[in-house]
Regions:
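Glycine-rich, flexible N-terminal cofactor/catalytic loop recognition
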Residues: 1-65
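Short active-site oxyanion
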Residues: 33-39, 112-115, 163-164
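Class I SAM-dependent methyltransferase SAM-binding "motif I" and its flanking Rossmann-like core
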Residues: 102-160
Length: 195
């Protein structure tokens, strides 16, 4: 495998960050975050401690679901200007139920290199530690927070034969367990893994 100098000008990096243990940040991710020109963070306050510990020098910008429309053109302009851009989420891989998906698609369309710096992912960490079948699985991300769309999605998931992984906010977890339809006769709940 050929290795290139990183960060490369005009390249977008999707960088996996720890989901509970700072030791999970790879040496490659650490070096890249120290060197990129721009770091787009889901929450600059949350990521600030990690980036300060790394002595990351890049300009930090917030990049989340509420400002994607305005930040996307700014980040694309940075790439067009030849700057290296890293995207990080609060925990795990950006683009997996976190910001990054739309930016990666736009960067591909504009023919900018898009490089994933692998790291922890809560979905796969929970799956492999659950003891449930993991050879084939379905990932649902976050469910709608309420209403008919949420009920409809739960009914669709109930028909799924593969192990299903979904995300839920901690304050809604007990409600989710109460909402699971009676048709979940095959439901197996692993021990909930703290992250």
């Amino acid at each position: 495998m050929m290795q290139r100098d990183e960060p490369a000008a005009g390249s977008l990096y999707l960088v996996g960050t720890p989901i509970g243990h700072l030791g999970d940040l790879s040496p490659r991710a650490q070096a890249l975050l120290r060197a990129v020109d721009v770091i787009a963070c889901e929450d600059t306050r949350h990521s600030g401690q990690l980036l300060n510990n790394l002595q990351a020098r890049g300009r930090r910008l917030s990049f989340h679901q509420h400002n994607t429309r305005t930040r996307l053109p700014q980040l694309m302009a940075s790439l067009a200007d030849g700057l290296s851009v890293a995207v990080i989420s609060d925990a795990g891989l950006p683009g997996i139920s976190d910001p990054g998906e739309e930016l990666a698609a736009a960067a591909h369309l504009a023919e900018h290199p898009v490089i994933c710096i692998p790291g922890p992912c809560a979905a796969t960490a929970a799956l492999v530690s659950s003891g449930l079948p993991s050879g084939r699985f379905c990932f649902e991300g976050f469910l709608p927070t309420r209403g008919k769309e949420r009920s409809r999605r739960l009914e669709q998931i109930a028909k799924e034969e593969r192990t299903t992984v979904l995300y839920e906010a901690p304050h809604r977890l007990l409600n989710l367990l109460e909402e699971l339809p009676v048709s979940y006769t095959h439901l197996t709940l692993p021990t909930i893994m703290p992250v």
